């Protein structure tokens, strides 16, 4: 590949890295706390963050388990 082709490729890669979409990690977390887990099933990853859960549910971590749960609110 010629040096011009390499420079073009490098420029396109740089532009692509700058234009990647904003991740859900940049969003604020949903309100409330995760309720306690009543039992210990095998490791399951149902979600990665709150925004992968429907409605007001939160992505709750219990050890190696990630699941969508209704939040609890503590006064």
Curated annotation (Swiss-Prot):
GO molecular function per UniProt: serine-type endopeptidase inhibitor activity
Disulfide feature: 34-60, 43-64, 47-59, 53-68
InterPro entries: Elafin-like_sf (IPR036645), WAP_dom (IPR008197), WAP_four-disulfide_core (IPR050514)
Compartment list: Secreted
Residues annotated as domain WAP: 27-72
Tissue: Expressed by the venom gland.
Endpoints of the signal sequence: 1-24
Pfam family, one: WAP
SUPFAM superfamilies the UniProt entry points to: Elafin-like
Keyword Iron attached: no
Function: Damages membranes of susceptible bacteria. Has no hemolytic activity. Not toxic to mice. Does not inhibit the proteinases elastase and cathepsin G.
PANTHER family assigned: ANTILEUKOPROTEINASE, WHEY ACDIC PROTEIN WAP
Family listed: Belongs to the venom waprin family.
GO cellular-component term (any): extracellular space
Protein name: Porwaprin-c
GO BP annotations, alphabetical order: antibacterial humoral response; innate immune response; venom-mediated disruption of cell wall in another organism
Organism: Pseudechis porphyriacus (Red-bellied black snake)
Keyword annotations of the record: Antibiotic, Antimicrobial, Disulfide bond, Secreted, Signal
């Amino acid at each position: 590949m010629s040096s011009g082709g390499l420079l073009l490729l490098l420029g396109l890669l740089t532009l692509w890295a700058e234009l990647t979409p904003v991740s859900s990690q940049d969003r604020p977390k949903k309100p409330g706390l995760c309720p306690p887990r009543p039992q210990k099933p095998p490791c399951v990853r149902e979600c990665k963050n709150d925004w992968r859960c429907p409605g007001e549910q939160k992505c709750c971590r219990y050890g190696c388990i990630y699941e969508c749960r209704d939040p609890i609110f503590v006064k």
